[in-house]
Amino acid sequence: RKQEEKRMGRLLIIGCGGVAGVAIHKCCQNSKTFSEICIASRTKEKCDTLKKKLEATTDTKITTAQVDADKVEELVSLIRSYQPDAVLNVALPYQDLTIMEACLECKVDYIDTANYEPEDTDDPEWRAIYEKRCKEAGFTAYFDYSWQWAYRERFKEAGITALLGSGFDPGVTSVFTAYAMKHYFDQIDTIDILDCNGGDHGYPFATNFNPEINLREVSANGSYWENGHWVETEPMEIKREYNFPQVGEKDMYLLHHEEIESLAKNVPGVKRIRFFMTFGQSYLTHMKCLENVGMLSTSPINYEGREIVPIQFLKALLPDPASL
């Protein structure tokens, strides 16, 4: 018992890309909360490189491990070996469900930053459920919370917590809304979330997080919540200008985003929720050209006897967000 009280938080972090790197740095800046972390990824060398970079700057004890987050049995083995207080999933949204399954089996709390979406959007089993949801809900985005919210009772029965969407958007945006609702307003009628990125790092085309996920999200139909139902738009159909403090005036476009779904469920009486993100003309022109020639497709193609997914091939050519 004394040993348990002495040890602070032990966190297993799955993922070592751009978003993961930011989360890992932040954990290491808060050693009193995160006294021990294990960084695990399919490529252990990336974890080792980050560990080497950080360990002289923090009191947090850092270890690394190799794991394939697509395989529940590998995740279970790692969780049982490391015995964390919680698992932080900053891998790909494709892997949310396998990591949640492993946490359930090991009875360990779960945290993530983005909701589930499938890697293969042509999978017949997933497609049948997706098309039913499109008709019932009224939006066609590939990602939604239904898959993860379905775990609610199982997590409750296991006595563990799943904290979903704990990045900035979703995450901080939901906290801001809840705080405003509790401390400033009797009623919130409309919520507009504006996401602005003011830099390009000198590249004609780059994404600030995983290119595959980013481009799938941006090239899809937009949607917003109004008067109790979803309203869907064409990609980039709704454009607004906004003068952002310190950044200046930017063009922003309405997108579908996951916190619209959770806020609509948790903000009583809200009449409209929208999400906007800024994009420069160069980004949009590049994206449209890539889409027109099929490079944003998630469907596998055969190239000289090898099966490749165009958007995954494109990801390999673009700047790594972790390097920006």
What are the residue ranges of the model-derived segments?
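N-terminal Rossmann-fold NAD(P) dinucleotide-binding loop
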Residues: 20-24
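C-terminal catalytic/substrate-binding lobe primarily of soluble NAD(P)-dependent oxidoreductases
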Residues: 182-324
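Conserved Rossmann-fold cofactor-binding substructure of NAD(P)-dependent oxidoreductases
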Residues: 67-84, 95
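N-terminal Rossmann-like NAD(P) cofactor-binding module of classical short-chain dehydrogenase/reductase
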Residues: 79, 85-89, 110-112
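Glycine-/Pro-rich loop/turn segments that contact NAD(P) or position catalytic residues
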Residues: 93-209
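Rossmann-fold cofactor-recognition segment
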Residues: 57-71
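Conserved N-terminal Rossmann-fold NAD(P)-binding element of oxidoreductases
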Residues: 11-18
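Helix N-cap at the beta1-alpha1 junction of Rossmann-like dinucleotide-binding domains, i.e.
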Residues: 43-46
